[in-house]
Amino acid sequence: MPANLTEGSFHANQTVPMLDSSPVACTEIVTFTEALVAEEWGSFYSSFKTEQLITLWVLFVVTIVGNSVVLFSTCRRKRKSRMTFFVTQLAITDSFTGLINILTDIIWRFTGDFMAPDLVCRVVRYLQVVLLYASTYVLVSLSIDRYHAIVYPMKFLQGEKQAKVLIGIAWSLSFLFSIPTLIIFGKRTLSNGEVQCWALWPDDSYWTPYMTIVAFLVYFIPLAIISVIYGLVIRTIWMKSKTHETVISNCSDGKLCCSYNRGLISKAKIKAIKYSIVIILAFICCWSPYFLFDILDNFNVLPDTKERFYASVIIQNLPALNSAINPLIYCIFSSSICSPCKMQRSQDSRMTYRERSERHEMQILSKPEFI
């Protein structure tokens, strides 16, 4: 995805900044280097470039392998649910992020110049931005689906097509909002003679309004929607639990109490909510520093110092980290992947048939793919 850098900052770096795979980055990120001796800066950045390449390769491998495991786990399930569908969509998005965003960044760092034709430049940039939007909007869709599962459980059971509709809208908006990228970016020769897939702005001042709009469409507005939705979900769960405590304390009919218990929010749904919240918290932790840094930088709030550059390099690694973390979160919540088989066989040998059946039923209910 396009990096928000001016040509002047590119000359200072002599390479593409870390998160070349995102449309929101830092403007004139190393202007402080004008005060440094050129030789000192060159040796400093060369060593840093090697570390960044190692980091990118690690993130790429973890992202592809981790999400491949998730896709294999969800696809081999005979009993699929709406939560399985959303987990699959998230894994698909993260996998393409690794292939199109992280891998192209690695290739670009090795080649230096952009070797492909102008059309490839525009298409690659477009797909990178599509994936950025999609990764956010899939989370919004997941939040809406969990809201309906908790607040309107009866309608939720009747609306099996809702998940596909939500994902369809998420991807449609992603492709639509990314169209300006096809116009903004193109292959160009910079004043230092290097050929790059770069923004074709008539003036660098265009970056500030453009990147501000992108930041709100990609991050701030979706985050506000997600926060409101999960606020309502938590409120609904709390109210139902309070009502449950009151009814149970006053309940004298055993059959009536059992019937009421069956109408409560299931443990499976609660675990799905926990899984969704952890995924969203990971998204917030990885992307908040990045977008906040970009907004402050676009409005010239940050000083031109070495510390600013060091911070920017670390911050620009966080978004790529998000696609590698998601499958690890799924692994933690899914006992089907992380449970040691030998331990289970040992436990099975000491259990009665009834105990094994009850444990198997609880494992099915606890897996996010069956929620």
From Swiss-Prot:
Highest taxon, organism lineage: Eukaryota
Residue pairs linked by disulfide bridges in the UniProt entry: C121-C197
Record membrane topology: Multi-pass membrane protein
Induction note: Increased expression in lung after ovalbumin induction in a mouse model of ovalbumin-induced lung inflammation.
UniProt GO molecular function: neuropeptide receptor activity; vasopressin receptor activity
Record's keyword annotation contains Cell membrane: yes
Residues in compartment: Cytoplasmic: 74-82, 145-164, 234-275, 334-371
Glycosylation sites per record: N4, N13
Keyword Transmembrane among record annotations: yes
Cellular component annotations (GO), alphabetically ordered: plasma membrane
InterPro entries: GPCR_Rhodpsn, GPCR_Rhodpsn_7TM, NPS_rcpt, Vasoprsn_rcpt
Family matches, as CDD domains: 7tmA_NPSR
Pfam families recorded: 7tm_1
TM helices/strands, residue ranges: 53-73, 83-103, 124-144, 165-185, 213-233, 276-296, 313-333
Subcellular location: Cell membrane
Entry keywords, A to Z: Cell membrane, Disulfide bond, G-protein coupled receptor, Glycoprotein, Membrane, Receptor, Transducer, Transmembrane, Transmembrane helix
One record GO biological process: righting reflex
Residue ranges, Extracellular side: 1-52, 104-123, 186-212, 297-312
Function of the molecule: G-protein coupled receptor for neuropeptide S (NPS). Promotes mobilization of intracellular Ca(2+) stores. Inhibits cell growth in response to NPS binding. Involved in pathogenesis of asthma and other IgE-mediated diseases.
Family label: Belongs to the G-protein coupled receptor 1 family. Vasopressin/oxytocin receptor subfamily.
Protein name, UniProt field: Neuropeptide S receptor
Native species: Mus musculus
